[in-house]
Design a protein with these regions (language model features):
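Electropositive, glycine- and tryptophan-enriched low-complexity nucleic-acid-binding patches
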Residues: 29-92, 97
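A contiguous, basic/glycine-rich beta-loop/short-helix subdomain that forms a polymer-engagement track
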Residues: 24-26
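Hydrophobic/aromatic beta-strand patches that form the interior of the parallel beta-sheet core
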Residues: 3-5, 55, 124
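Two-metal-ion acidic nuclease core segments, chiefly of the RNase H-like superfamily
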Residues: 106-124
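Active-site- or DNA-interface-adjacent structural scaffold in DNA-acting proteins
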Residues: 1-18
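RNase H-like two-metal-ion nuclease catalytic core shared by retroviral integrases
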Residues: 124-133
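A short acidic (Asp/Glu
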Residues: 13-16, 99-108, 133
Length: 133
């Protein structure tokens, strides 16, 4: 089984000005300054290239190694019944700062994932960082 995992930039949630224009009949009221942003979401996603299925996960703090592995755990819990025959998992990663080959925390968390699930996990990195397109 092969999956591709990636995270995106933090999204600030709220009625903040984006410098755009209203396309509706009535303009949407927004705050005129984006200071003291309180609400944010960190999006992450997993794609199964063979089936075309995708799985989105969100956090509220930062893009970290643990955030990425937690997303993989969530995906596995969601798909475990359907993928019960899978013994090997190949994970494509973009070699970004939260998951690159030098991050011992990421490797430690991935080892925990492999031990918990019983899967043989292989990490495949795109090089250089952020060139996963």
């Amino acid at each position: 089984m092969r999956i591709s995992v990636d995270t995106k930039a933090i999204i600030h949630v709220g009625e903040y000005s984006r410098g755009g224009r209203s396309r509706g009949v009535v303009a949407v009221k927004v705050l005129d300054h984006d200071m003291c942003l309180k609400e944010k979401l960190v999006p992450g996603g997993i794609l199964e290239p063979v089936t075309g299925r995708s799985f989105l996960f969100f956090g509220t703090h930062y893009k970290t190694s643990d955030f990425m592995v937690d997303g993989i755990f969530l995906w596995w819990e969601e798909r475990r019944q359907e993928l019960s025959g899978v013994k090997h998992l190949v994970i494509n990663l973009d070699n970004g700062p939260e998951c690159n080959g030098h991050r011992s925390q990421f490797h430690r968390s991935m080892t925990e994932f492999a031990d918990t699930t019983g899967l043989c996990v292989r990490l495949v990195y795109y090089n250089p960082p952020y060139h996963s397109k």
